[in-house]
A protein has these predicted regions:
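N-terminal anchoring/stem segment of glycosyltransferases
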Residues: 1-62, 208-213
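Generic beta-sheet signal
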Residues: 3, 65, 92, 186-188
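Structured loops at beta-to-helix junctions and adjacent beta-edge loops in soluble globular domains
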Residues: 8, 95-96, 112, 170, ...
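Anionic group-transfer/hydrolysis microenvironments
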Residues: 9, 69-73, 191
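Short, glycine/charged-enriched secondary-structure capping and boundary segments
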Residues: 20-21, 80-83, 203
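A structural signal for short, well-ordered beta-strand segments and their strand-loop junctions
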Residues: 36-37, 66-69, 92-93, 152, ...
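GT-A fold catalytic core of metal-dependent nucleotide-sugar glycosyltransferases
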Residues: 42-43, 47-119
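Catalytic core and acceptor-binding pocket of nucleotide-sugar-dependent glycosyltransferases
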Residues: 49, 53, 116-213
């Protein structure tokens, strides 16, 4: 099985990618992934949407792909996320329990070949082009969730939902300034939704602790 670890940083987020990259490279080398960090050639939509295009390209060349946002840090690389995913699953993601409901998140997103037509379907749902969660709203709709109806909840179980493996939050822990890091965290999403400078500072603050893990 060939696997790619995919991310990119554009429109001011290059610094975040630079901070994340050492941990991503160590994880990729340890578990046999090819690290892909090239941005899309042209931004025709808000940047977050272009994870769809780069993942389609990755799945043309590799059997499986792991996407992580560029403000994600690897806290513990000893285990490979892929080992937890059942063979029958098409994808693996987390759902975060938030004041806005149960929100599936693509900040850490594992995909297999059957996800190619799903990615194409997400791209076609351009009614979410400027939605607050960007392409994640389209993914949530295809899963059977209600991104436009708060609190977000599962309305119906779709085929995609049944083919989804729900990761434990240790694989996508949300980290924020002033909040202790969960000692079981393996992958930390650093202050998502905050200004780039806040995310970068948290990533810099976490780096010494993660190196000592």
């Amino acid at each position: 099985v060939t696997r790619a670890l995919v991310t990119f940083g554009v429109t001011g987020m290059e610094e975040l990618l630079e901070l994340a990259q050492p941990g991503l490279r160590e994880y990729a080398d340890r578990h046999g992934y090819t690290l892909l960090t090239e941005p899309p050639l042209a931004l025709t939509r808000p940047p977050s949407w272009h994870k769809i295009t780069v993942l389609l390209e990755a799945l043309d060349e590799y059997d499986e792909a792991l996407w992580v946002d560029c403000d994600v840090m690897i806290a513990d690389s000893t285990l490979d996320l892929a080992d937890e995913i059942p063979a029958e699953s098409w994808q693996a993601i987390t759902a975060h329990h938030t004041p806005e409901g149960e929100v599936p998140s693509a900040g850490v997103w594992y995909l297999r070949q059957p996800m190619q037509p799903v990615l194409e379907a997400i791209w076609r749902l351009d009614g979410y082009l400027h939605f607050k969660w960007w392409e994640q709203g389209a993914l949530q709709e295809l899963l059977g969730y209600t991104p436009h109806e708060l609190p977000v909840h599962l309305e119906r179980e779709t085929e995609l939902y049944r083919r989804t493996h729900w990761l434990g939050l240790e694989w996508h822990t949300l980290g924020f300034p002033g909040r202790p890091l969960d000692p079981g965290a393996r992958v930390v999403h650093c202050a998502p939704g905050n200004p780039i400078s806040v995310r970068a500072q948290l990533m810099r603050d976490l780096t010494p602790a993660l190196k000592g893990a």
